[in-house]
From Swiss-Prot:
This is Uncharacterized protein HI_1581/HI_1582. Signal peptide: none annotated. To E.coli YecM. Pfam families: YecM. SUPFAM superfamilies: Glyoxalase/Bleomycin resistance protein/Dihydroxybiphenyl dioxygenase. CDD domains: VOC_EcYecM_like. Coiled coil: none annotated. InterPro entries: DUF991_YecM-like, Glyas_Bleomycin-R_OHBP_Dase. One of its GO terms (cellular component) is cytosol.
């Protein structure tokens, strides 16, 4: 087994459990993940050392695509040399934010981000209202609307995060954005 294969095995050790939890959440959200691009998978860590360990591991499998400051903290986007299969899609981006003051009950795989594009001539508020309508009647879910602020970024980045209200069994989250992260990065570089 090569070093890359060993690293990918370590990287994906908990991925199958995470995938099942995400599929359960998607079912409760009444969305079919195959209808949407899974843009990237995201990790959460509570310490600088955990972040460093994950970054070392991820860099053995890929390269830094971005290390922007988002909402006051550095978030690494790692582009994998070999995409991982997740929910019958191949995903090549892993998000690794440096820790902030919040403590996560479970470190490791935390959320995915999917793309629900704007409709023609749709405003940000119209997009938020449209996406929100999918989930408002689902009382077992928590919905959080935000717009992450990336230093120097001008493209609107609304986000709708959906998770279970009771996180004791399933702590995962599905975040919805109108653009893929690669499109954001291309747009930022072309300005």
């Amino acid at each position: 087994m090569t070093n890359l294969q060993e690293n990918l095995t370590a990287l994906s050790a908990d991925l199958a459990i995470f995938e099942r939890k995400i599929q359960h959440l998607a079912k409760e959200m009444t969305i079919d993940l195959s209808h949407y691009e899974i843009d990237h998978l995201a990790l959460r860590v509570n310490s600088e050392q955990s972040a460093k360990n994950w970054l070392i591991l991820l860099l053995k499998c890929g390269r830094i695509l971005s290390d922007n400051i988002v909402n006051g903290r550095k978030i690494y986007l790692i582009e994998l040399e070999k995409p991982v299969k997740f929910a019958n899609q191949f995903v090549d981006i892993i998000e690794l934010p440096l820790p902030k003051n919040k403590k996560y009950p479970i470190e490791g795989w935390e959320h995915i981000e999917i793309v629900m594009p704007f409709l023609p001539k749709e405003s940000i508020n119209e997009w938020i209202n449209r996406v929100n309508m999918y989930f408002l009647x689902l009382t077992q879910l928590t919905i959080k609307v935000s717009e992450p602020k990336v230093d120097g970024e001008r493209l609107p980045n609304p986000s709708i995060a959906v998770s279970f209200t009771d996180k004791t069994v399933n702590h995962t989250c599905i975040k919805v954005h109108p653009y893929s992260i690669k499109k954001y990065l291309r747009f930022s570089k072309n300005e």
